Amino acid sequence: MRTTNGRVRNARAVQDENRARPPMVVRLANQWWDRLIGAVFSGSLANQTARYAAHRTTRDYVFNSVGFGVWGFLFPLLTMVASQLVGTEGAGMFSMAFVYANLIQFVGMYGVRTYQVSDVDEMDSFGAYQIQRVLTCILMVGVGYLYCSLRGYAGELLWICFGTFAFRTVDSLADVYEGRLQQQDKLWLGGASQVLRCVLAIITFSVALLATRSVSLACIGMAIAATLSLVLFTIPLTYFETERSRGWELLEIREIFVECFPTFLATFLFSLIETVPKFAMEGTLPYDYQLYFNTIYFSAQGITMAVGLVYKPQLVRLANIWSNPSHRKRFDLIILAITGVAALITAAMFAFNATVGVALLSLLYGTDFEAYRTQLYLMTIAGGMTAVIDFLYQIITVLRRQETATRIYLIAFGVAGVLSITLVTTIGFDGAVYAYLLSMAALFVMLVVQYVMIRKNG
């Protein structure tokens, strides 16, 4: 009897302890806050003892996949929220501003991430990468201001652009710290940082829009949330969990700008190629069509994201494989394998869109997308080509031959400009979709030929 009573008391004690124990999220936040405050009082973030091990392949894939997925799903999810709460016109304005923010983000990123993480011997210091990124983010802000001034934006649209541009600027700055974590083989921590920033942005935007019905205030709140996550989590985490880097030199900053300029130019041109049809629609078609185009574009973007989840965690290892001449055939097999994966994902996405995709989009956005079924199919095919284009360019960067692709992107940009202006003017929204598809097809063919030539000559 005493034993039974003792067991009952022990069970009750455990239950009471569990009730008193705060939720896991609260415990993690408290632990992080204690660690952060302790580091601040000690006078140095970089001298703290790392608590997390490197070389965690499974964690790298899981956290990077979640982080990349949340980051990629951020735009479509926020567009869904805006469409449901403020209608297609307001959502179209937000969608257009976010597209332009994504475009000028390439100025802030400057094509450095792949170069940074494949710098396995740390030829350039982390301090140099940080300073270079601050400079490009300042340039990004200047480009955004200049664009809004030239377009004559005012009122609600101007503030929407301000909020989205600010958010993407913070996102660009955070990328250099997450790149440092990946370079130190702690990619999963970079993924965790990305998840936190995006989740806070989604929550803040949604709550602010629900409370105020103001897209501009929601965008500004989103930017503030991202800034807090950068200052209170991403930057301290990077200093805590990576080795102290040597001091920076001015020559290193110059070298990063020079070496990554071809990558920046190519990626910026690629983003321009994707954006030109949307530029052509602005002023010609109502803002609603920006929403429709970007919604079916998300299908293409999803394919690129899915393929990126396969190969991006392995960029450092691919660089090491390429550095050994005896492993070049293995390198080629990896290229073929990932291209095959892209084809399979494209086929799966096409089948999904043909069965439930249109109905799902109509439900999520609160508007009928049946009239855009054919355009959705065409955009899915373009997405498969886009995924391979992105992959091949990353590989060319790993091979340090990125300058060879710049001419190709310039040609493709010219093709996209001519097609977009001509087709949108003559046949409207359908013309924007056809222009995007044909531009991606031209770029795909030219880039495949370029890669074959590099391998043949190298």
Predicted regions and their residues:
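Hydrophobic alpha-helical transmembrane segments
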Residues: 157-165, 191-241, 259, 297, ...
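N-terminal membrane topogenesis motif
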Residues: 1-73, 117, 121, 127, ...
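Helix-loop junctions and terminal segments of transmembrane helices
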Residues: 75, 105-124, 183, 300-326, ...
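Membrane-water interface segments that mark the loop-to-transmembrane alpha-helix transition
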Residues: 28, 55-72, 97, 102-148, ...
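Interhelical loop/hinge segments that connect adjacent transmembrane helices in multipass membrane
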Residues: 38-57, 188-193, 215-222, 231-274, ...
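Interfacial segments at transmembrane-helix termini and the short loops linking adjacent helices
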Residues: 86-92, 148-164, 287, 354-384, ...
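Signature of the first transmembrane helix
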Residues: 23-43, 52-110, 141, 202, ...
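Transmembrane helical elements of multi-pass membrane transporters/channels
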Residues: 60-79, 196-201, 217-237, 249-316, ...
